[in-house]
Structures are given as C-alpha cells and as structure tokens.
Amino acid sequence: MILLLPDFVGHPSCFQTLLSHLPEQVESANYHTLAMKEDLSELADLIADGLKYKPTWIIGYSFGGALGYELCQRNFPTAHLVMVDSHLPSSSLREMPVDEQYQHWLTTDIQDWLSLMQELNEIKLPVILNNISLFNQWQPKPALQQAWWIRCTRNNINVNTDWHLLIQYIHQFDASVCHHEVMKESSVISYLIKLTQGVTFS
C-alpha cells in the first residue's frame, strides 16, 4: 500500500496528478477529517491507527514529509519514505508567528482556491494553522537508515536541508521547479511512479 501525506494545507487534492498513475491500493490522508493534535508524533499515531494496511511506501509532500518521518520512526520502520521538497524547521521559522507564516505562504491563486474550499467546507483554517504550529515545534531525532528526497531547486531559499544529520543515506532527486508546482511536474511524477514500481535507477 502507498500512503500519501499532503502538505500543511492538509487536503489530498495536491496529489491529483500523481493519483491517476498509481495502483489502486493507495490511501491519502486528509488532515481535515482528523482530530487536531498538539504534537506531530500524536498525529502520526492517529493516522497509523486508522490505516487498513501497512504502507510499503510513504510519500509526503512538504509538511507531509516530516509527518512521514515520524510514521517511519514510530509506526512503520520497514516502509520506504519519499519526502517531496520537505525541509526541517529553521530557527527563523520557529520564531515567526503562525499567522505570519501563513500569510507569507499565500499567493493569489492559492488564496482563491483556499477560499473556495473553505466555502465548500472541505478545509478548515484552524487545521492549517495547527499544522504550521506542529511543524514549528517538531524536534526530530536521528532514526532512519535511508529515505528518498525530492528537492525543488527553484526559489528555494532560507530552508534547513540538514536531513543527512537524521538519515544515514539519502537518495536525492533535484527538480528545477518551484515548491507549489512540484506535484504537477512530469519529471517528479515519473520518478515517483518508477520508485513505487521498483524500477532500478542506474
């Protein structure tokens, strides 16, 4: 089973392009259908308890990569983790108020989409703000033998990329695309499909 973990917005629609290429046995988390937690590890436990099957692959986008790290450490040590442009919380982020981070992240296109989704009651702003807070407070411990990391190389500044301090071996794939577009990028989708199908990269 492949488990998909969205970014801090928390809605599985971010995986729409990828989902059309994956096998049927896929579960996508939707944070807006779950109880809000005070710690990222608690959210990981909640998601793990609700799964029908153990995942063989966990694909986490942005915030979802950090959540996937916790799931692999705590619940599914044999699962393969793919972090899609996920980063560690920097000191500057930890010091920035949650509301300010949220406003900094918004673009016009995203804001329009968020407004529509809130009107449809598909997403809830308190859940998004809580996810930002969970990430800011996250204190990861070295745990994993290996993981796959897709890194966006366009417009990526002031981010903490010290995953090598926590993961013994990182398979890195660079994509020349900005963070908001990475889950629609054809090279990234192709890479993820090959990974989950067990294709060997030369």
Segments the model singles out, each with a brief description of its role:
Residues 1-202:
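A hydrolase-biased, glycine/serine/histidine/acidic-enriched motif that marks catalytic-domain neighborhoods
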